[in-house]
Amino acid sequence: MLTRTRAVPASSLLPRLWLALAALIFVSLTLAAHAQERTVRIGYQKYGTLVLLKGRGSLEPKLKAQGYRVQWSEFPSGPPLMEALNAGAVDFGSAGETPPIFAQAASDVLAYVAHEPAAPKGEAILVPKSSAVQSVADLRGKKVALNKGSNVHYLLVRAIEAAGLTLADITPVYLAPADARAAFERGAVDAWVIWDPYFAAAEAGGNARVLADGTGLVPNHQFYLSSKSFVAENGPALDAIVAAVAEVDAWAKDNTDAVAKELSPSVGIPAPILSIALKRQTYGIRPLDEAVTKEQQRIADTFHGLKLVPKTVDIAGAVRKPGS
């Protein structure tokens, strides 16, 4: 027996066709949006404004509105972060004065975007409390631990110069902070040049005495850095990042105890100790002015003169221009 198939009226097919078409358009637009979405890769360290910015999540909405997503990568210190920036693995990050100079000597990639005010009390030369070393001049012939190419490298250079010594008069021992602290505590080195919060943690440990901090020797600026190509192509995104950092700075300046509690788990240092470090920190992101640019050039020229970097570098030529 044959079964007769009833014809479906064209009028009843139209709604289904419209739904299918709408779904197709939605999927196409979604795929197109994801294809157009760009990524800002931000390098951060365990301590500082950028890790606060990451934790608060306030940057993501600002950049999403411009078609960007944010990818965060943690680094143990400034030098490897700058290496990643030179290699094109990071678009934005922060470091002290010395790491960008070593990076510039290696490649003409880096751009200075902004800086925080000077914080000379945030780094120091430490000796054991029982040490016979009473002045920087007493470091002659001693082993001094430091992170090569970091901010404290310049502090050591300036401090021994002021004491009438040269690098040849001491034995630098290049170690990352954790290894340097271990060497310091077991007496394998005579002094340790270090920055906050490791400086504050060593003080709190009870066996460290401050031989000299950066006061009168170095400014100890914190710089925000990018690549020249990223600056040229992503000006509005950089402006959004700087604005987000400024917001976090404004909050952190008046809430150091709250900041300490927020950072403590990631840094692995108790909040009360972090509070000491944070009170030595400065806040207020701003563009590089002529004075800061000249001081950074002075640091670069010093390292070149000591043959610690292989060539001269041009700081002013790497500074982001207003409106770019």
Residue ranges, per PLM feature:
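N-terminal secretory signal peptides that target proteins for export/translocation
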Residues: 1-14
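Bacterial N-terminal signal peptides
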Residues: 12, 17-29
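Sec/Tat signal peptide C-region and signal peptidase I cleavage site
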Residues: 29-35
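Short, glycine-/small- and polar/acidic-enriched structural segments
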Residues: 36-166, 171-174, 190-196, 209-211, ...
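Pocket-lining segment of extracytoplasmic ligand-binding domains
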Residues: 98-99, 172-173, 177-265
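Secondary-structure end/capping motifs
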Residues: 232-308
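Conserved C-terminal helix/tail region of periplasmic/extracytoplasmic solute-binding proteins
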Residues: 301-324
